[in-house]
Amino acid sequence: MKKMLTLFTAFCLLAVLLPALQSGAAAAPQAKLAVYVDKDNHSFIPLRFLNGFAGIQSVLTASGGQIQMSRGGNSITFTPGKPGASVNGKPVSNNMRPFSENGTTYVPLSLVSQTLGIQLQWNKEAGSLTLTSGADTGTAVTATLPVQNGTLIKSSSPAVVSGHHTYRVGGRSFSVQTVTVSLLHPSVKLDAVLAGNTVGKTEALASIAKRSNAAAAINGTFFNAYTDGAFKTPYGYIISGGKMLKNSSGDKRTVFAYDSNLLAELIPGSEFKARFDAGSVHGALQAGPRLLVNGKVALNVAAEGFKDPKILTGGGSRSALGITRDHKLILLTSGGATIPQLAQIMKQAGAYQAMNLDGGASSGLYYNGKYLTTPGRLISNALVVQTK
């Protein structure tokens, strides 16, 4: 009888603890869905992405003994941690071993794409890979994933770091504050947040950051800061969680946009609406002008529709963001720079793509609970960085 009670007690404890353990495991951040290219130039793709893409069925057996995938009558089987594979039941040569990291299983991309009929387009400048299936049947399914080179980002590595730098441009020194965000870090999220969660309101940058549980934040789009009215119109597209908070049809200014994997890019304003309608944009802010294209200064301020002398010729407090080739986001503030000088600063800071944000008294940068650059007024919206 005593033994039965002990077993019953143990069962009850297990019933209580197991959901909690499962909940804790579920709460751990998963790796972003990204193609991984190792130091030997071998490419791997997350099994989690493949499952369901273009009708692919993928299974990691309960014992972890085999990885099985199938599509359109073709099948492929891997053994985790071991070379070799089986295609349609026949052994094939394969030197790349499936592996798991950060809770994600990766499988060799080349053999999977060849066997299951997936076309690959490597986008060097964007650091991404576009996968297409079914193009020959008129039912094409397409997805684009970031490409991570060298080593996978560990969840224990820093996700967001700050810095203070001095850059020389044209014989003049500029002191800048930066926050660098590892976009492919498992814990990182971005969001575009409205002041007061309402179009037309204003709020302190620190207040927006704190109520968003943000590790970092920078001011966002231009807005009508000088009206006497309570409603201060933001200018440009604002997208959050895939929803359009502020439309700006016809606006040609540059848009910073990112998808659900935080694959970030800068898009001309004239092209943005079509991209948003395609369903790939998870978040976005429109400001401009564009500063860098593929690592080179590329200013076309008038073509983006700017007429204000503060942008065309003047200097002042500046905010900007940049994207590096290895999927880092640079948030930067500087004082007294013209737009051409800001472009040079962003290049020296390591950005490959870059654009200007609202500046002047709006310019502000927040990190780790305090201001690195304090804005001189309330702002309309902000780009915030969250770590789960």
Predicted regions and their residues:
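N-terminal post-signal-peptidase region of extra-cytosolic proteins
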Residues: A34-V35, S63-I67, N94-R97, G163, ...
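Sec-dependent N-terminal signal peptides of Gram-positive bacterial secreted proteins and lipoproteins
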Residues: K2-A27
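Zymogen propeptides
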Residues: L21-A26, F53, Q57-V59, E101, ...
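Active-site-adjacent helix-turn-beta-strand microarchitecture at beta-sheet edges
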Residues: N224-V297, V301-A302
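Signal peptide-directed extracytoplasmic domains
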Residues: S70-G72, I76-P91
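Conserved, well-ordered active-site substructure
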Residues: T137-T139, D228-S249, F306-L357, S362-K388
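Extracytoplasmic Gram-positive cell-surface binding/anchoring modules and repeats
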Residues: A28-G65, P91-S128
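Short acidic-glycine loop/turn motifs at beta-strand connectors
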Residues: S182-H185, A225-Y226, A257-L263, N294, ...
